[in-house]
């Protein structure tokens, strides 16, 4: 079997367990893994009896060894923790460890569903549960799902995402029970997610009309919260992803001293982004100024960065800068 790779062995195993079981296995793999296995499977021509027997035999041996090691490891870990921490604290800690181990995939399945199917699956749940689910998804998937809700539900869920502080342990069991019915036993991660940054990242990926409506709805509830979301929606550091033509247009509007101070607090890739869009002479002068200018107060840096972002927004609103990604632009 030396000529068979791990992927080849996996393909052989998947082809022996039937379509339904293979589909269940695929649900627990990453997109890249599914792609690799699918490509290998499509290229299969013939599997000899010896190859099949060898693969199944190896799988059986490894499965038995893994199961035995897993049981012994858990028992060993419990014994060590009890001796170190006492029965009560050890039990609590072990429960957390095993729960984390068993729920690392979270509700990742929803990331690979069609947005319409995912939206249909969760739209009738309580808005807080929907918000809790969405903060665990890729931002683009969450935005696509939100776009399929009616406006009232979309605004309610986004407000809950913006004020989300994580799942409290007391509520975790109840929430998991609800989600088990929806997601075939998938559980939520405990890590703290959500909040203003998450809300901003999701809104950034929504269509302009929906974005404006959501911000308006949040502002009616809490003006300060809405402003925090707006402040997070496009950061100075995000300029590193803006196209060169837009950066060149921005440079026509920004004062050189303001840019110097703003870039004092920027990462090297962003500095280089600006420098390579300048004339050679202007870039050389700015490099010298950045190297020779002494320390600048953080408050000064932040003020200049905010001032530049105001220019960015103005140029984006007039269509002179493109600062979004994908089909939609942020205005």
Swiss-Prot record:
Cited InterPro entries: Flg_Motor_Flig (IPR000090), Flg_Motor_Flig_C (IPR023087), FliG_a-hlx (IPR011002), FliG_M (IPR032779), FliG_N (IPR028263)
UniProt xrefs under SUPFAM superfamilies: FliG
GO cellular component, one term: plasma membrane
Domain of life per record: Bacteria
Keyword vocabulary terms for this entry: Bacterial flagellum, Cell inner membrane, Cell membrane, Chemotaxis, Flagellar rotation, Membrane
Alphabetized GO MF terms: cytoskeletal motor activity
Recorded topology in the membrane: Peripheral membrane protein
One of the GO biological process terms: bacterial-type flagellum-dependent cell motility
UniProt short sequence motif Part of the EHPQR-motif, positions renumbered to this chain: 125-128
Residues marked Part of the EHPQR-motif (site): 160
Cell compartment(s), UniProt: Cell inner membrane; Bacterial flagellum basal body
Family membership: Belongs to the FliG family.
Protein's job: FliG is one of three proteins (FliG, FliN, FliM) that forms the rotor-mounted switch complex (C ring), located at the base of the basal body. This complex interacts with the CheY and CheZ chemotaxis proteins, in addition to contacting components of the motor that determine the direction of flagellar rotation.
Name used for this protein in its record: Flagellar motor switch protein FliG
Source organism of the structure: Salmonella typhimurium (strain LT2 / SGSC1412 / ATCC 700720)
Gene that encodes it: fliG
